From Swiss-Prot:
PANTHER family: ATP BINDING PROTEIN-RELATED, SF3 HELICASE DOMAIN-CONTAINING PROTEIN. Belongs to the asfivirus helicase C962R family. SUPFAM superfamilies: P-loop containing nucleoside triphosphate hydrolases. This is Putative primase C962R. It comes from African swine fever virus (strain Badajoz 1971 Vero-adapted) (Ba71V). ATP binds at residues 636-643. Disulfide bonds: none annotated. InterPro entries: AEP_C962R, Helicase_SF3_DNA-vir, P-loop_NTPase, Phage/plasmid_primase_P4_C, PriCT_2, Viral_Helicase-Primase_Cplx. It is an enzyme of class 3 (hydrolase). It comes from the Viruses. Its EC number is 3.6.4.-.
Length: 962
């Protein structure tokens, strides 16, 4: 059997001693029932007793103090752990705290002769710093020693409880003692390496431990000896001193108290303060917040140990230190004491504004919750730098939590108790939240080495049932329980009293019965049900995949927030659940698959400017935030590669990020508000959506079109689900063998559309003289599109164009110069929108024109043009006026003084009339004519070109439009 460390013993013994020590039970009864009337608020000046175990503070009168001292003395004699402090009052005894660094690891002798000499020197400084009362007085000195030397460090306290001094007087005494050469010589003779700096200057006013009490995870100081010094003001030079005999016969908790005035041995001697003491000082009520936090919060104790594993750079270098502070703040607002303690590990920085920096950083962390670093990161850093020590601490933490339950409930373990330990073990790996149907849903953070589907690594996987927890309870948890058995048997082997041994025997018997439950299916299901409440992280589901710059990929998480994109293939705290199975690899144009695809793109879209624009546009599919309000309409008669390209984008992004959409979504009438629309819900959270293969002459529903393209919130619902609101984030492409019919003159709709017409056709036997006929390769459709290497290469191409778009065009598609698509869009609009055709053919911008047209005159001119060029029909003037106000003429329309609309700065041409100097057509300069199609040479690095108003690369050649 191995004895547990003192730290283990400390936390477990606190629980166990309540069961078998009647003295401890009596003390708890006294505190909870009889002394509760004397409780004070933390920080109250009335406080004189602090209970570190509970964090409660008391203002006890002298009679109740004596009762408390009696109970504490009985507990001390039984070896009970205690954590009581007394607050030093305005006048109280003197405590000197010596923290020694030794030349060796041997305990210094500190024999009575040396301690007697030390008493004389201390008294000299007392006489010099205060006014002792007239008459003869006995002054008692007590020496309490640290139980053992730890890494060359040792300590002792000098207690002078009867001498009642002001705080300022104590500080004066301590200040002069620090420079006493005789005292330093005495300490040096005891093997002390730091005699000049070992006296703690803060011991004058901080709360002092009552005798028998200790700091958390430390043994209490033990009384070495005591001395009685006699001072008579009538003969101040004669100061006899002798060692106190039978000292253990007294109530030492009472006698060594700095505030007690009714001791049997020690009687109070009140000393007048010096001049500096006349102004009453406020005595600090140091609440030892870190100690109290660690007593009450097992996780805080655990984090304290974990933080100790971090190397110095984490508290020296600002970026790493700030991450630790953010992690603590995001984990719990109560962990501020941990942040202070960790920051003080670098005294140089702490003493030069460190506290102020921590204050600011802590407040920033509280306000800016988007920086999601929590304790999970601290665990990762500690495991990374000290894996073996980390493992030991983690295992010890599980043991301590379970042991507390075992000792508190006499060995009987229930579902919640096991769940609590499981949460400590697996709380960083599993999360539970409630979904929209009110059901508890488990999520597991997938790590390397465990079974998974492609793409799940480094992401939160949804679990129908946490099977790993079921297995873990039976196979791993049993090892922790075996340590509890070992711990109980260790105590049974010790020479305890009969009642204590009987307690451990009963405990072991009950615990062995509990151990077998972890192999029972029903019991484990009960544990899992209780664990749901512990693992619950509210709104976790709502936070999943909300960062539009993060994309789950096959080998981790891709961040496109910075340029270049960054692959996160290690531990992180981004709540990512969705993913594509594609692995991210940086763009490499020399990669064979990349070369193949770049050449294929060159064949599919022969115009350089159009090819670049379309690739920029498609690259925005990897971003799931709000985008420019655009939709690409792609016309092609078949066998031209448009379907291959659109499907490849969707296949690369996967079903979580892309969706093929039903064309009826664009062509059908909108459903009523209360009806479901599963097709529309397919756009929720998607970065890409595409339509393909429509029937001839499909008429688009323009109101639905605007709703889908406009950035902003929309509402819809799935069948049997509640109405949801979500943002439209998809990059959308609609492909067809036939032109869509868009029956609107609304400029707000048309400015959101871009149109491209395929020119190339892939044939089995292409005409060598026709540059727009290419040799078909069925492998693209049946083989390449399914190849993971091909998909990875195409994904790298998308990321490359996304980065290029951000760097060169500030992420804005509309800044990309593309005369081919602009011209084709204009031509398409004119074929659909007769009003726009009239405007682009007959209305010109004429800054020098003096003629001003009433809107009714423009309506008349359009009606005459329509009847002459399109068809004779009856026009409704009011409707035409409204259409003109929503057309490209909108910016030229003004209000006249008589509140009518007028057209200014333009001129309406008559038939066969030409432009005058300074005039220009409204719309694209080519007036909708198709541009010549540039054909790129196969080896031209077309992807490096940046479209602007300059000419294309030299290797581009021109060919007539087919």
């Amino acid at each position: 059997m191995r004895e547990e460390s003192w730290e283990d013993h400390d936390t477990i013994q606190l629980t166990a001693q309540r069961k078998y020590l009647a003295e401890v039970q009596a003390l708890e009864t006294l505190l909870t029932r009889e002394l509760s009337a004397f409780l004070t608020e933390p920080g109250s000046k009335k406080t004189n007793i602090i209970n570190r175990i509970t964090g409660k503070t008391y203002a006890l009168p002298s009679t109740e103090l004596l009762r408390l001292y009696e109970h504490l003395e009985q507990c001390r004699k039984q070896g009970a752990l205690m954590y009581f402090l007394e607050r030093q009052g305005t006048y109280s005894g003197l405590m000197l705290d010596y923290d020694l660094k030794l030349n060796t690891n041997a305990v210094p002798p500190l024999e009575p002769p040396a301690l007697s000499r030390l008493c004389h020197r201390i008294f000299v400084h007392i006489k010099n710093s205060s006014v002792l009362p007239e008459g003869s007085h006995k002054i008692h000195f007590f020496f309490t020693l640290k139980p053992e030397v730890v890494q060359g460090k040792y300590g002792f306290h000098v207690l002078i409880p009867g001498l009642k001094l002001a705080a300022s007087t104590k500080k004066s005494i301590i200040g002069s003692l620090q420079h006493d050469a005789t005292v330093q010589k005495i300490l040096h003779e005891q093997g002390v390496a730091n005699p000049e700096s070992c006296l703690d200057p803060h011991s004058a006013s901080v709360p002092s431990l009552l005798y028998g009490s200790s700091k958390l995870n430390h043994k209490p100081y033990q009384l070495k000896t005591g001395f009685e010094l006699v001072f008579d003001s009538s003969d101040p030079d004669y100061i006899p001193i002798h060692q106190i005999k039978n000292i253990e016969s007294y109530n030492l908790v009472s006698e060594l108290s700095l505030t007690n005035e009714q001791g049997s041995l020690v009687r109070p001697v009140y000393c007048a303060a010096d001049i500096a003491a006349e102004k009453e000082e406020e005595i600090p009520t140091d609440d030892h917040s870190l100690s109290i936090l660690m007593l009450h919060d097992p996780e805080a104790r655990y984090l304290h140990k974990i933080l100790n594993l971090l190397p110095p750079e984490y508290y020296v270098e600002y970026p790493l230190w700030s991450n630790v502070v953010f992690a603590l703040a995001n984990t719990s607002a109560n962990y501020r004491p941990l942040a202070e303690w960790f920051s003080q590990k670098c005294p140089e920085k702490w003493n030069t504004g460190g506290k102020e920096k921590l204050e600011k950083l802590w407040n920033d962390a509280s306000r800016h919750t988007e920086k999601k670093i929590t304790k999970r990161s601290i665990m990762y850093w500690a495991h990374k730098h000290a894996p073996q020590q980390y493992k030991e601490i983690v295992e010890q933490g599980y043991f301590s939590i379970l042991a507390e339950y075992v000792y508190s409930y006499n060995g009987m373990l229930e579902h919640y108790m096991i769940a609590k330990v499981i949460y400590a073990m697996m709380g960083n790996k599993f999360v539970v939240d409630v979904d929209s149907n009110g059901k508890y849903v488990w999520f597991e953070f997938v790590l390397p080495g465990q079974p998974m589907n492609q793409g799940e690594i480094w992401k939160w996987r949804k679990e129908v049932n946490p099977d790993e927890l079921h297995i873990y309870i039976s196979e791993n948890f049993s090892r922790v329980m075996d340590r509890i058995t070992e711990h109980i048997k260790y105590h049974l082997s010790q020479p305890h009293e009969t009642n204590i041994l009987n307690y451990y025997k009963k405990l072991l018997k009950a615990f062995e019965r509990s151990k077998s439950k972890i192999f029972n299916d029903s019991f484990k299901k009960g544990v899992i049900r209780q664990a749901e409440f512990l693992f619950r992280q509210r709104s976790f589901i709502q936070t999943l995949d909300t960062n539009p710059h993060l994309l789950g990929v096959g080998n981790g998480v891709l961040s496109i927030e910075t340029i270049p994109a960054k692959l996160i293939n290690h531990f992180h705290e981004h709540p990512i659940h969705q993913y594509t199975h594609i692995c991210y690899v940086p763009f490499n144009p020399e990669n064979p698959w990349t070369k193949l695809l770049l050449n294929a793109l060159q064949d599919i879209i022969p115009e350089l400017d159009a090819r670049l624009w379309i690739m920029f546009y498609l690259s925005t599919a990897i971003f799931r935030g709000l985008k420019e309000a655009l939709m690409l309409l792609w016309l092609g008669g078949g066998c031209n590669g448009k379907t291959f390209l659109m499907r490849l984008v969707a296949m690369v992004l996967g079903d979580h990020y892309a969706s093929k959409l039903n064309i009826s979504l664009l062509t059908s009438c909108r459903e009523t508000a209360e009806k479901p629309n599963s097709a529309f819900m397919r756009l929720k959270g998607r970065g890409y959506g595409y339509f393909e293969e429509t029937n001839k002459s499909e008429v688009l529903n323009t109101s639905r079109l605007k709703e889908m393209v406009n950035p902003g919130d929309v509402t819809a619902r799935e069948l049997n689900q509640k109405q949801e609101s979500f943002q439209m984030t998809a990059t959308m492409v609609a492909a067809s063998n036939y032109n869509f019919i868009i029956d609107t003159t609304d400029h707000g709709t048309w400015r959101r559309l871009r149109h491209y017409r395929s020119k190339v056709k892939f044939c089995h036997n292409p005409d060598p003289g026709n540059p727009y006929e290419k040799k078909e390769d069925p492998r693209f459709i049946h083989e390449y599109i399914m190849d993971p290497d091909c998909q990875n290469a195409f994904f790298s191409i998308l990321v490359y164009f996304w980065e290029k778009l951000q760097k060169e065009y500030n992420g804005q598609i509309k800044k990309v110069f593309c005369p081919t698509i602009e011209s084709e869009t204009e031509a398409y609009r004119k074929s659909q929108d007769t009003l726009h055709r009239f405007i682009t053919e007959r209305v010109v911008e004429s800054p020098s024109a003096e003629t001003v047209y009433n809107l009714s005159e423009v309506v008349t001119a359009y009606a005459e043009w329509y009847n002459a060029n399109i068809n004779v029909k009856r026009h409704i003037a009011l409707e035409l006026s409204q259409e003109l106000e929503n057309s490209v003429l909108e910016k030229y329309l003004q209000w006249s003084p008589n509140k009518t609309r007028i057209l200014k700065g333009c001129r309406i041409l008559h038939k066969f009339e030409t432009l005058q100097p300074g005039e220009s057509y409204i719309g694209v300069s080519t007036a909708g004519t198709l541009l010549n199609t540039p054909i790129c040479e196969p080896k031209n690095k077309w992807w490096e070109w940046s479209p602007n108003l300059s000419a294309p690369p030299e290797k581009e050649a021109s060919a007539p439009t087919p």
